[in-house]
UniProtKB/Swiss-Prot annotation:
<dbReference type="GO" id="GO:0006422">
    <property type="term" value="P:aspartyl-tRNA aminoacylation"/>
</dbReference>
<dbReference type="InterPro" id="IPR029351">
    <property type="entry name" value="GAD_dom"/>
</dbReference>
<dbReference type="InterPro" id="IPR002312">
    <property type="entry name" value="Asp/Asn-tRNA-synth_IIb"/>
</dbReference>
<dbReference type="InterPro" id="IPR004115">
    <property type="entry name" value="GAD-like_sf"/>
</dbReference>
<dbReference type="InterPro" id="IPR047090">
    <property type="entry name" value="AspRS_core"/>
</dbReference>
<dbReference type="Pfam" id="PF01336">
    <property type="entry name" value="tRNA_anti-codon"/>
</dbReference>
<dbReference type="Pfam" id="PF02938">
    <property type="entry name" value="GAD"/>
</dbReference>
<dbReference type="InterPro" id="IPR045864">
    <property type="entry name" value="aa-tRNA-synth_II/BPL/LPL"/>
</dbReference>
<keyword id="KW-0030">Aminoacyl-tRNA synthetase</keyword>
<dbReference type="GO" id="GO:0050560">
    <property type="term" value="F:aspartate-tRNA(Asn) ligase activity"/>
</dbReference>
<feature type="binding site">
    <location>
        <position position="447"/>
    </location>
    <ligand>
        <name>L-aspartate</name>
    </ligand>
</feature>
<dbReference type="GO" id="GO:0004815">
    <property type="term" value="F:aspartate-tRNA ligase activity"/>
</dbReference>
<keyword id="KW-0436">Ligase</keyword>
<dbReference type="GO" id="GO:0003676">
    <property type="term" value="F:nucleic acid binding"/>
</dbReference>
<feature type="binding site">
    <location>
        <position position="481"/>
    </location>
    <ligand>
        <name>ATP</name>
    </ligand>
</feature>
<dbReference type="InterPro" id="IPR047089">
    <property type="entry name" value="Asp-tRNA-ligase_1_N"/>
</dbReference>
<dbReference type="InterPro" id="IPR004364">
    <property type="entry name" value="Aa-tRNA-synt_II"/>
</dbReference>
Length: 583
């Protein structure tokens, strides 16, 4: 080994010992002929002192930031007045005996310590500099700990780690596939997997019983802060299980991951809510439940109302829901109400009713349309007090829920609400199985075409498919969808029935999903599992807004890699071998 220790690990326990350290020059300064170098590696920094009597003093004097050095030196305590309490190695320094320059560095476009202030494309172009930033190194280390903790947990609980293929067949469901042309099979293509879904279900039919994988998945979709064309997920599947068993496996893994990342393990079991209840209470299927501001159904107050906004909504089978903004009048003025109304319209509403409670009465443009009895009932139902505000949405449930969800999220910011805890997990379960696509006159999977319906709802597949609830679930953490999964269909006849509702003919179903369908009719056990976003989990634990901050070499928002300048044009001979012509 070239070194005896890492820079950040040297402390007063090493005083009077000779250590060999390697790293980058983080900074240098000359104080009265004595050279001070801060030597950095991934663990931290240590101060190196090169005295003028040192035989390598002249060589060390040529070192500049980001030069790579090997230093042999004696560890000593700093004088009391020179101790740096902000550095874990701040009590000691290393007096150099030998200095060797292992490599020089050109003038860099930015200093690693300042990389987080640089525009993202430049950071990604020079990622080898950006990753030297201590925050980035911490993020990658945390990601590693998350992956290792997940592996340990599943390995210790009877799961087998199995790799599934990266080159597979295209099944045009969900996002677009990344296609890979075959040289050997002219005119045919592989697809990169959007998930290991069919393979892991086939493994359950194969008797594997418990599978896990740190899996790569690929989706050709428009990007956001929490999306990449390629991502990593902690993927599991289990045989002979109920929803409760799958939840317990996820909760156990999360506990180990949090401990590995230096966080307190969250209390289990996590809170569970039905999809319909979550949408009614929070207006979102991935709510941040740390904030105590809820949506309330107030339709019962207005059953005989003359205010057409609410009466028409109720007459057409819609809902009327409200959010109380505690002391909202202290934070929200008329201009802000107009912006909230614009937000409601952008989210699908025709408008937004708002009221302010002051001097024991409601005020606002719409107050005059309500009767005294309705306003009194509203005040009682929502426990409205002085300076509170009320925001009301009225329309079809599928319109009101997301609108009020958007208003809730904005009110959390406007009211400067504080979360009531650091971490809040929520299992959202029993999503609708299907949703209707009117322009195509067919049903489509609300989440996953392989999700099982609730047993009691199976008869509804023949009469009212839109009312069928499923064993689909999401795990939400602080308003972020962390995992998605379900109990699967393990019978071919039921799976084909659902695919038929989605207008997959038997021939199409056999062509696209034949591998899985054949496995299901060969004695597949009941099974279920989930895929959890490793990138998202690491980003949350690192308190990062974007998953790009926890991925070593991510793409930009346009799926471009500035470091490798890909995607790129390839040579004609390569295209010819693949039987491809570019027009």
């Amino acid at each position: 080994m070239m070194r005896t220790n890492y820079c950040g690990d040297i402390n007063k326990n090493y005083v009077n010992s000779v250590q060999v350290l390697c790293g980058w020059v983080n900074s240098y300064r000359d104080h009265g002929g004595v050279l001070f170098l801060d030597l950095r590696d991934r663990t931290g920094k240590v101060q190196v002192v090169v005295e003028p009597t040192n035989k390598d003093f002249e060589l060390a004097s040529t070192a500049r930031t980001e030069y790579v050095l090997k230093v042999t030196g004696l560890v000593r305590l700093r004088q009391t007045e020179h101790i740096n309490p902000n550095n874990p190695t701040g009590e000691i320094e290393v007096v150099a005996q030998e200095v060797e320059i292992l490599n020089t560095s050109i003038q860099l476009p930015f200093e690693p310590d300042n990389s987080r202030q640089i525009n993202e494309e430049t950071r990604l172009k020079y990622r080898y500099i950006d990753l030297r930033n201590p925050v980035m190194l911490h993020n990658l280390t945390t990601r590693h700990k998350v992956a290792q903790a997940a592996r340990r947990y599943f390995s210790d609980n009877g799961f087998i780690e199995i790799e599934t293929p990266i080159l597979t067949r295209s099944t045009p469901e969900g996002a677009r596939d990344y296609l890979v042309p075959s040289r050997v099979h002219e005119g045919k293509f592989y697809a990169l997997p959007q998930s290991p879904q069919m393979f892991k279900q086939t493994l359950m039919a194969s008797g594997v019983d418990r599978y896990f994988q740190i899996a790569r998945a690929f989706r050709d979709e428009d990007l956001r802060s929490d999306r990449q064309p390629e991502h990593t997920q902690i993927d599991i599947e289990m045989s002979f299980v109920t929803l409760a068993d799958v939840f317990a496996a996820g909760e156990g893994m999360i506990a180990e991951v949090f401990k590995a990342a230096g966080e307190d393990a969250p209390a289990a079991p996590f809170e569970q809510m039905e999809y319909a209840d979550v949408m009614a209470k929070y207006g979102s299927d991935k709510p941040d439940i740390r904030y105590e501001i809820d949506i309330t159904d107030i339709g019962g107050i207005f059953t005989n109302s003359n205010f057409k906004v609410v009466s028409d909504a109720l007459a057409n089978g819609g809902v009327v829901r409200a959010i109380k903004a505690k002391y909202g009048a202290k934070h929200i003025n008329r201009s802000t109400c107009d912006k909230l109304t614009d937000l409601a319209k952008a989210s699908g509403a025709k408008g937004l009713v708002w009221l302010k409670y002051s001097d024991d009465k409601f005020e606002g443009p719409s107050a005059k349309f309500f009767t005294e009895e309705e306003l009194a009932s509203l005040q009682h139902t929502l426990s409205v007090e002085k300076d509170d505000m009320v925001f009301i949405g009225a329309d079809k449930e599928k319109v009101v829920s997301p609108v009020m969800g958007a208003i809730r999220k904005e009110l959390i910011k406007l009211l400067c609400l504080k979360p009531n805890k650091k971490w809040a997990f929520l299992w959202v379960k029993h999503f609708p199985l299907l949703e209707f696509v009117p322009e195509e006159n067919r049903w489509d999977a609300a989440h996953n075409p392989f999700t099982a319906p609730l047993e009691k709802d199976i008869p509804l597949l023949d009469t009212d498919p839109g009312k069928v609830k499923s064993y689909q679930f999401d795990l939400v953490l602080n308003g972020v969808e962390l995992a998605s999964g379900s109990i699967r269909n393990h019978r071919r006849d039921l799976q084909e029935k659902i695919l038929n509702l989605m207008k997959h003919s038997p021939e199409q179903a056999a062509l696209r999903f034949g591998m899985l369908l054949n496995a299901l009719e060969a004695g597949a056990p009941p099974h279920g599992g989930f895929g959890m976003g490793l990138d998202r989990l690491a980003a949350l634990l690192c308190k990062e807004e974007s998953i790009r901050e926890v991925i070593a070499f991510p793409k930009t928002a346009t799926a471009y890699c500035p470091l490798t300048e890909s995607p790129n044009v390839v040579e004609d001979i390569q295209l010819k071998e693949l039987h491809i012509k570019i027009k």
